[in-house]
Swiss-Prot record:
The active site is at residue 91. Bifunctional enzyme with both catalase and broad-spectrum peroxidase activity. Binds 1 heme b (iron(II)-protoporphyrin IX) group per dimer. It comes from the Bacteria. Belongs to the peroxidase family. Peroxidase/catalase subfamily. This is Catalase-peroxidase. Its EC number is 1.11.1.21. GO terms for molecular function: catalase activity; heme binding; metal ion binding. Transmembrane segments: none annotated. It comes from Pseudomonas putida (strain GB-1). The record marks 87 as: Transition state stabilizer. Residues 1-21, 365-390 are annotated as: Disordered. Coiled coil: none annotated.
Length: 751
C-alpha cells in the first residue's frame, strides 16, 4: 500500500474545462485588463524617476566587464558574450511589427511565455541569467526591458563598433501579453495558417529548436514557393516561433532568391527598408556564430515545459557537454568571419569574394561553404584554439548577394565600409527604439541630438499657453460655428483615436488629421468640413496675439460639444482640457509610415472600410485594447458616441435615441428594452433591426458592434449599470472621464 497521502482535491483553482474551451470564439475581454495593478509588485512605482537616479556609466562599465567574464556553466564563444547579447537584444526588439504596433522590446516580454520558449530564442534564457547579477545589483533603477536592449548596445561598443545612441524608458510588466496575435499554428515552426495552406508542417514539434529531422530538409527544393507566400497580417515572421525568416530558406528550401523575398516581407513589416535590412544583417553577422553541434533530438523541452529543477532554463542539451563547442541552438553551425568579436567589413568581403556551395551542419541543416575548399583555416573555433575553420554562410546571408535589390546595396556597403557602419548604427538604433513612441518618453544621457523621421517628430511647444478665458471664448466660437455636436465629437475622435498603446504612435498631438495620408482615409470622411471651420477660428484667434494649435483646437472643439451635450441632458460641469499640443508639418510626417495607422474598422464610429473575416465586435475589442481602454470605458464610450451622433457618415446604426446630440443613457436603456425584438437584416449578420414585439414597427437599427453590448454577458452586465434608473449620472461622469483619457493618450509631456 502506498504511503503517499491522498490529496483531498482532485483539481485546484484555475484548472478544469474553461469557458474558452467551451466557446473558443467568445469575445475575450481579458485583454483589456492585463497588466493591472494586481499583477505588479509596486503599482505606484515611477520607473522614469528611478532610472534618472541610475549611475548609467557604472552600469555600462559592469556590462562591459561581463562581456569577457566567461562562466563555466555557459562559456562564452571566443571568450566574449557580445554576440550572444546582441542576439538577445535583437530578438527582444525584433518581435515588433508595424501592422498593429505590438511586440517589441518595450516591456521586457522576452522573459515570459511564449517568447521565452520560442524556437528562435533558444539559449537566450542563458543570456538573461548571465545578466541577473547586474540586474540584482542595480535593482529597480534599470528595468529588464531597458537592460536587455542596453546590453546589446554595450556588446557592440565592446567589440569596437560606434553606436548611434541609447535611450531608456522601457518599464517592465509582470505577466505575459495576452493581446498579441502570434499566429494560429498549434506546433512550433508551423506556418500553414499564416500562409493560408496546410503544406508547411512543424519541423521539430515540441522540441523548441530550429532543426528538422535531416530527411525533411529540402524535400521540395525545386518547388516555386513565391505564389504561395501571402503572409497573414499583422504577422511579421514566416513561421510560428521565429523572429523573421527561416535561415535555411523558405520552408527549409535553400534558395537564396526566395529567401530574399521572405526577408523583404518580414523586415518591411518591422518598418525596415531595403538598405536598413541589408545593414542590419551585414552588421549583425559581423559578430559571433550559430550553433548546431549535433542532432536536434539531443535538445530537451523549452523553458515553459522544462522541469522545476531547471529553474526557468530550458533546452537542456545532452550532446557532449551540452555547452560551449557542443551547443545546439538553431542547428546551424556557421561562423561568418575571422574576427567574430571585432567589428569589421569581413562579412561582406567573404560573401562576395567566395563562391558558395551547399552543405549541411552536423545537425543536418542546410548551410553554405566556400567552393574548392577555399578559406579553410582562416576562421577560429569558438572554444578550441587548436582548431580552425572556413567561413560559412546561411541561405538568408546569400540572399544579400543574389536578391536583385539587396545585391547592389550590399556591394556598395562592401566597397564603402564607412557607409555600412553609419547605416548599421542608425538601423540598429531604429530597431531597438521603434516601439518607444515620441521623444518625450526617451531617457538617459546617450539620447542622440538628431531628430529622426521614423520617430514622428513634433515641433517644440510654444511656452505661452492659453488661459481659461481664452478657452471659454474659443468654446463659444466653436459652438456658434454651425457645426453639430456629432461633427465636432467625431472629428476629435478621428484625431485622437489613431493612438496605439502598443508602440505609442498616433493620437491628436501634431494635428496630422489635416495632412496626408490621414486626410484621405475613408474613416475620416467629412472631417474636412470641420477642419476648415476650425482653421478659420484658429486664424482669427491667433491674429489677436495669443496662439492655439489646430491640434488643441480639434480636441477643444470636441470637448465643447461633449459639454453642450451633457448640459442639454441636464448636467452641469466642465470636461477637462489641457492645452499644449502642437501642429506637425508635412516634412515631419512620413506618409508611408503613417499609412499603417489607418483604421480599417472603428466600431466606436460604426465604421468598416470593407467586410472582413474577423467579426466586427472583435475588431472593436482590438481597437479598444490599442486605446488602453478597460471594459467599462469601452462600454461607456460606445454608448455615449452613439447618442452624440458621432457615427461615420451620419449612419443611424446604433443611435438608439430620439434626441441625438444629447449625452443621455438612451443607448443602454433602449438596447436592454425587452419590448424590442432584434433580427438580422443582412445575410452576413452584420446589421440588425429592432421591432416592437407587439406592433412589429421598426424602432431601431444596429450593427454587430451595437448588439454585442446586449448579447455578451460581461458587456451586458456593464450596460445594465449605465441603463438603470440610477445609472444616468454615472454614465455622464464615466463618459467624460473616458473621453478625456482618449484625448490625452499621447500627451506624454503631461506624464
Amino acid at each position: 500500500m502506498s504511503n503517499e497521502s491522498k490529496c483531498p482535491f482532485h483539481q485546484t483553482a484555475g484548472g478544469g474545462t474553461t469557458n474558452r474551451d467551451w466557446w473558443p470564439d467568445q469575445l475575450n475581454l481579458r485583454i483589456l485588463h492585463q497588466h493591472s495593478s494586481k499583477s505588479s509588485p509596486d503599482p505606484d512605482f515611477d520607473y522614469a524617476k528611478a532610472f534618472k537616479s541610475l549611475d548609467f556609466q557604472a552600469l555600462k562599465k559592469d556590462l562591459t566587464a561581463l562581456m569577457t567574464d566567461s562562466q563555466d556553466w555557459w562559456p562564452a564563444d571566443f571568450g566574449h558574450y557580445g554576440p550572444l547579447f546582441i542576439r538577445m537584444a535583437w530578438h527582444s526588439a525584433g518581435t515588433y511589427r508595424i501592422g498593429d504596433g505590438r511586440g517589441g522590446a518595450g516591456s521586457g516580454q522576452q522573459r515570459f511565455a511564449p517568447l521565452n520558449s520560442w524556437p528562435d530564442n533558444v539559449s537566450l534564457d542563458k543570456a538573461r541569467r548571465l545578466l541577473w547579477p547586474i540586474k540584482q545589483k542595480y535593482g529597480n533603477k534599470i528595468s529588464w526591458a531597458d537592460l536587455i536592449v542596453l546590453t546589446g548596445n554595450v556588446a557592440l561598443e565592446s567589440m569596437g563598433f560606434k553606436t548611434f545612441g541609447f535611450s531608456g524608458g522601457r518599464a517592465d510588466v509582470w505577466e505575459p501579453d495576452e493581446d498579441v496575435y502570434w499566429g494560429s499554428e498549434k506546433v512550433w515552426l508551423g506556418g500553414d495558417t499564416r500562409y493560408g495552406k496546410d503544406q508547411l508542417k512543424a519541423q521539430a514539434p515540441g522540441q523548441g529548436d530550429l532543426v528538422a529531422e535531416p530527411a525533411k530538409h529540402g524535400e521540395e527544393q525545386n518547388r516555386d514557393l513565391s505564389a504561395e507566400r501571402n503572409l497573414e497580417n499583422p504577422l511579421a515572421a514566416v513561421q510560428m516561433g521565429l523572429i523573421y525568416v527561416n535561415p535555411e530558406g523558405p520552408e527549409g528550401n535553400p534558395d537564396p532568391v526566395a529567401s530574399g523575398k521572405d526577408i523583404r516581407e518580414t523586415f518591411g513589416r518591422m518598418a525596415m527598408n531595403d538598405e536598413e535590412t541589408v545593414a542590419l544583417i551585414a552588421g549583425g553577422h559581423a559578430f559571433g556564430k550559430t550553433h548546431g553541434a549535433g542532432p536536434a533530438d539531443n535538445v530537451g523541452p523549452e523553458p515553459e515545459a522544462a522541469g522545476l529543477e531547471l529553474q526557468g532554463l530550458g533546452w537542456a542539451n545532452k550532446f557532449g557537454t551540452g555547452k560551449g563547442g557542443d551547443a545546439i541552438t538553431s542547428g546551424l553551425e556557421v561562423i561568418w568571419t575571422s574576427t567574430p568579436t571585432k567589428w569589421s567589413n569581413e562579412y561582406l568581403n567573404n560573401l562576395f569574394n567566395f563562391e558558395w556551395e551547399l552543405t549541411k551542419s552536423p545537425a543536418g541543416a542546410h548551410q553554405w561553404r566556400p567552393k574548392e575548399g577555399k578559406g579553410a583555416g582562416t576562421v577560429p573555433d569558438a572554444h578550441d584554439p587548436g582548431k580552425k575553420h572556413a567561413p560559412s554562410m546561411l541561405t538568408s546571408d546569400l540572399a544579400l548577394r543574389f536578391d536583385p535589390i539587396y545585391e547592389p546595396i550590399a556591394r556598395r556597403f562592401k566597397d564603402n565600409p564607412d557607409q555600412l557602419a553609419d547605416a548599421f548604427a542608425r538601423a540598429w538604433y531604429k530597431l531597438i527604439h521603434r516601439d518607444m513612441g515620441p521623444l518625450a518618453r526617451y531617457l538617459g544621457p546617450e539620447m542622440p541630438n538628431e531628430e529622426l523621421l521614423w520617430q514622428d517628430p513634433l515641433p517644440k511647444a510654444d511656452p505661452s499657453t492659453i488661459g481659461e478665458q481664452d478657452i471659454a471664448a474659443l468654446k463659444a466660437k466653436v459652438l456658434a460655428s454651425g457645426l453639430s455636436v456629432g461633427e465636432l465629437v467625431s472629428t476629435a475622435w478621428a484625431s485622437a483615436s489613431t493612438f496605439r498603446g502598443s508602440d505609442k504612435r498616433g493620437g491628436a498631438n501634431g494635428a496630422r488629421l489635416r495632412l496626408a495620408p490621414q486626410k484621405g482615409w475613408a474613416a475620416n470622411q467629412g472631417v474636412d468640413k470641420v477642419l476648415a471651420a476650425l482653421e478659420k477660428i484658429q486664424g482669427e484667434f491667433n491674429n489677436g496675439g495669443k496662439k492655439i494649435s489646430l491640434a488643441d483646437l480639434i480636441v477643444l472643439a470636441g470637448t465643447a460639444a461633449v459639454e453642450k451635450a451633457a448640459k442639454d441632458a441636464g448636467y452641469s460641469g466642465s470636461v477637462g482640457f489641457r492645452p499644449g499640443r502642437v501642429d506637425a508639418s508635412e516634412a515631419q510626417t512620413d506618409v508611408e509610415s503613417f499609412a499603417v495607422l489607418e483604421p480599417l474598422a472603428d466600431g466606436f464610429r460604426n465604421f468598416s472600410k470593407a467586410r472582413y473575416s474577423v467579426k466586427a465586435e472583435k475588431l472593436l475589442l482590438d481597437k479598444a485594447q490599442l486605446l488602453t481602454l478597460t471594459a467599462p470605458e469601452l462600454t461607456v464610450l460606445v454608448g455615449g458616441l452613439r447618442v452624440l451622433g458621432a457615427n461615420h457618415g451620419g449612419s443611424k446604426l446604433g443611435v438608439f435615441t430620439d434626441k441625438p446630440g444629447t449625452l443621455s443613457n438612451d443607448f443602454f436603456r433602449n438596447l436592454l428594452d425587452m419590448s424590442v425584438e432584434w433580427k438580422p437584416t443582412s445575410a452576413d449578420n452584420e446589421t440588425f433591426e429592432g421591432r416592437d414585439r407587439k406592433t412589429g414597427q421598426v424602432k431601431w437599427s444596429g450593427s454587430r458592434v451595437d448588439l454585442v453590448f446586449g448579447s455578451h454577458a460581461q458587456l451586458r452586465a456593464l450596460s445594465e449599470v449605465y441603463g438603470s434608473s440610477d445609472g444616468a449620472d454615472k454614465f455622464v461622469r464615466d463618459f467624460v472621464a473616458a473621453w478625456q483619457k482618449v484625448m490625452e493618450l499621447d500627451r506624454f509631456d503631461l506624464k
